[in-house]
Swiss-Prot record:
Subunit structure: May be constituted of a homo- or heterodimer.
Region called Disordered, residue ranges: 344-406
Alphabetical GO biological process terms: cell division
Compartment(s) of residence: Nucleus
Protein name: Protein swallow
UniProt organism field: Drosophila pseudoobscura pseudoobscura
Listed Low complexity bias regions: 371-383, 392-406
Length: 537
């Protein structure tokens, strides 16, 4: 649809305009000339400027007038009818004067004046259903303003009101508002004093206030008691937490102590495994009785050395029957059951070879009593001098039983290297200066009848002394008939296996009482002779 079809009049109108005479141009100018002058707008001001904008009614009237001037607004039909009447009058006058060309020019130039003039009634009727955007915008503004006015009437401020002034509290009838109380006071002032009904009203209100105050006090006390209850619970929880922490600390301390005790017990058990007692323990030995009888006066080692020197078996005894477990016999002497292997000389370990000295057990050594107790003879055996030195006879390498000439004891100075060394079933005595003026600790093994000299560690000694004595220790381990639990041997077990097990000799000529007796033989070594040997070295 083109603009000419909708916005301009029909073709018959243009034909009528063309047929008009040209003389009507002057009249057209006289009619529309005033629109070209600015004073025309001042003489005819806009209708919405004449009213006061501050007035609400004037604003609404101006909006209604502007809505009527809209093109598509169906309300503005009056203005369109007026415009149509003006157009008809203009056409009639133009046809009468014959100024058709001037009328056409003036009609086309009227666009600049108002675009509303070119719309025909047909166009307005056709677009009557279209809603104007301007009118809709103005209507929305009116609706929002009306909604805002209605909201202010319904708004009630309850945030700053007391509780008894809220509508909910007033519905319960328990309180009166300030206005109601003021009205009651005024009514009391205006009423007479003798009116009973007026006198009851303030009394009732006062009672209500007192009851309300009492209720508030009760609520306050309840809240305080509940607060105290919560505080008590909190204190109990805090005490429980403190007790739990204290118990945890105690348990942790106990656990640490138990761990330390367990470590100590494990270390002690490992040390105890280093020593294993022999399978068979003799009932009584010569050394046991000697230590029991001479324990307070023991200060020398000469008695045990004399036993070793005079440890020859009795006449008529069979040397092949000397075993470790032999029960027959009258004397037990500490002898070597195996021959020590050849070892390299070591300057750090001085060796003392004590020559054997024959003993006569029947005459001058000991006499057996019928009750089994032995008495020591006080003869001249202690003053006997050893005039000759005789080397110890070599033992039989193929058999673990000693020969008849094997009566020498080899006493070595050993080093105590293990700091945790333990020596059960024995006694350790402090160093003794009487025997050859040598410093050392002597170990008396009661169970195996052994005498061992233990010396302190020599710093200047070779760092590997175990390599020198490895062969002899291996032979002793293989032939000593003592069971050990571990392959690794300590210094304590080595010292206990140096001299070998005890042996007993049998004598068929002795009686039962004499054979069952235990002898204590004391033949000390002469100091002069031993001192001479010590100085000769």
């Amino acid at each position: 649809m083109s603009l000419e079809d909708e916005s301009f009049p029909a073709d018959e109108l243009f034909e009528q305009l063309n047929s008009a005479s040209i003389g009507a141009s002057r009249q057209f100018k006289s009619q529309f000339g005033e629109h070209d002058q600015p004073e025309a707008f001042e003489r005819n001001p806009a209708p919405f400027l004449t009213s006061d904008c501050s007035d609400e009614s004037s604003f609404i009237d101006a909006a209604n007038k502007s809505a009527k001037t809209c093109v598509s607004d169906p309300v503005g039909l009056d203005q369109c009818e007026e415009e149509e009447e003006v157009d008809k009058d203009f056409e009639d006058s133009a046809l009468a004067n014959g100024n058709s060309e001037l009328q056409i020019k003036s009609a086309r130039s009227s666009k600049s004046v108002s675009y509303q003039d070119i719309h025909s009634a047909h166009t307005k009727r056709r677009y009557k259903h279209v809603t104007s955007k301007v009118a809709k915008y103005i209507a929305d503004i009116h609706a929002q303003d009306q909604q805002r006015r209605n909201a202010t009437k319904k708004f009630q401020r309850h945030s700053s009101m007391p509780e008894y002034l809220t509508p909910t509290a007033r519905e319960r009838g328990a309180h009166f508002s300030v206005d109601e109380l003021h009205n009651l006071d005024e009514s009391l002032d205006n009423s007479s004093a003798g009116n009973i009904t007026d006198a009851k009203t303030p009394n009732d209100s006062y009672e209500r206030l007192l009851s309300e105050n009492e209720r508030l006090q009760n609520d306050k006390e309840d809240l305080k008691s509940y607060s105290d209850y919560l505080q008590t619970k909190l204190d109990e929880k805090a005490m429980e937490n403190m007790q739990l922490r204290r118990n945890f600390d105690v348990l942790r301390t106990d656990l640490t102590d138990c761990k330390e005790k367990l470590k100590r017990n494990q270390s002690y058990s490992l040390r105890s495994l280093n020593f294993c007692p022999p399978a068979s323990v003799p009932k009584a030995t010569q050394t046991d009785h000697e230590l029991l009888s001479h324990a307070p006066n023991i200060s020398r080692l000469s008695n045990m050395v004399a036993i070793a020197d005079s440890g020859t078996p009795l006449p008529g005894s069979n040397t092949n029957n000397l075993t470790y477990d032999s029960s027959a016999g009258s004397i037990e002497v500490a002898l070597l059951s195996v021959a020590p292997a050849a070892r390299q000389p070591n300057a750090g370990k001085p060796k003392k070879n004590i020559q054997p000295h024959s003993l006569d057990f029947s005459n001058d050594s000991t006499e057996a009593e019928p009750n089994g107790n032995g008495t020591t003879s006080t003869g001249h055996s202690s003053s006997r001098a050893i005039t000759s030195r005789r080397g110890a006879a070599p033992n039989n390498s193929e058999s673990s039983h000693p020969s008849s000439n094997d009566s020498a004891i080899e006493v070595e100075a050993l080093d105590l290297r293990s700091p945790y060394h333990r020596q059960p079933q024995g006694s350790i005595y402090p160093p003794m200066q009487d025997w050859g003026h040598s410093d050392g600790i002597y170990f008396f093994d009661k169970r195996n009848s052994r005498v061992i000299e233990v010396r302190s560690i020599n710093v200047s000694q070779s760092s590997n002394p175990e390599q020198n004595s490895g062969t002899s220790e291996t032979n002793l381990l293989n032939q000593s008939h003592v069971q050990f639990r571990h392959k690794r041997t300590s210094m304590g077990t080595r010292m206990l296996r140096l001299l070998g097990p005890c042996v007993r000799c049998t004598d068929t000529n002795q009686s039962v009482n004499a054979s069952s007796a235990t002898y204590t033989i004391g033949l000390p070594l002469l100091r002069e002779e031993y001192g001479g040997r010590h100085t000769d070295r």
